[in-house]
């Protein structure tokens, strides 16, 4: 079968990203399917493509497939998939994964958690996620203020 060689995964990842940024989800998925050895960058790119096109359930399914393939999500992967969560229970499950990965204090992840909990009106957990950051940046503060402003 024809596939993108594992010798240079950068090419496949770049193509997935390019198609995703152009809004060509099907092309991004086709290239992703050709990548023989999918790393966290490839998985994150295809998950991001689905989220940007509004295919949230599919993005979460891809995230689950990524974990089943024993590819560890990074901070950016978690932050993207948290934006796709449609049920609080899903978000809490992913939050447990984040804690297990010891990424909960990273600003990009904690800010995504603040936003996710805020969308569901769980201000206590949003505040707790914020408090995990040692040095919240302006995006974190803006997100927290927005969450409190919504409720």
Tell what function each PLM region has:
Residues 1, 5-6, 16, 95, ...:
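Acidic, Ser/Thr- and Pro/Gly-rich low-complexity regulatory segments
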Residues 2, 35-36, 66, 98, ...:
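Alpha-helical solenoid scaffolds that mediate protein-protein interactions
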Residues 3, 15, 22, 33, ...:
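Polar, glycosylation-prone regions of secreted, cell-surface, and some intracellular proteins
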Residues 4, 86-93, 103, 121-125:
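Proline-centered turn/helix-capping motifs that create local helix->coil transitions or kinks
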Residues 7-8, 12-13, 17, 28, ...:
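Pentatricopeptide repeat
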Residues 24, 55, 61, 87-90, ...:
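Residues in the short coil linking paired helices within alpha-helical repeat scaffolds
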């Amino acid at each position: 079968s024809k596939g993108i060689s594992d010798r240079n995964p950068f090419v496949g990842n770049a193509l997935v990203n390019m198609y995703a940024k152009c809004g060509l989800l099907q092309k991004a998925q086709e290239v992703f399917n050709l990548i023989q050895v999918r790393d966290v960058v490839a998985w994150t790119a295809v998950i991001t493509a689905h989220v940007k096109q509004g295919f949230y359930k599919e993005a979460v399914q891809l995230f689950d497939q990524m974990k089943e393939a024993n590819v560890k999500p990074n901070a950016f992967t978690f932050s993207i998939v948290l934006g796709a969560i449609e049920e609080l229970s899903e978000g809490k499950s992913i939050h447990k994964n984040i804690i297990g990965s010891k990424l909960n204090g990273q600003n990009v992840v904690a800010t995504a958690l603040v936003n996710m909990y805020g969308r569901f009106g769980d201000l206590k957990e949003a505040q707790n996620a914020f408090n995990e950051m040692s040095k919240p940046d302006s995006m974190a503060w803006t997100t927290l203020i927005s969450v409190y402003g919504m409720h």
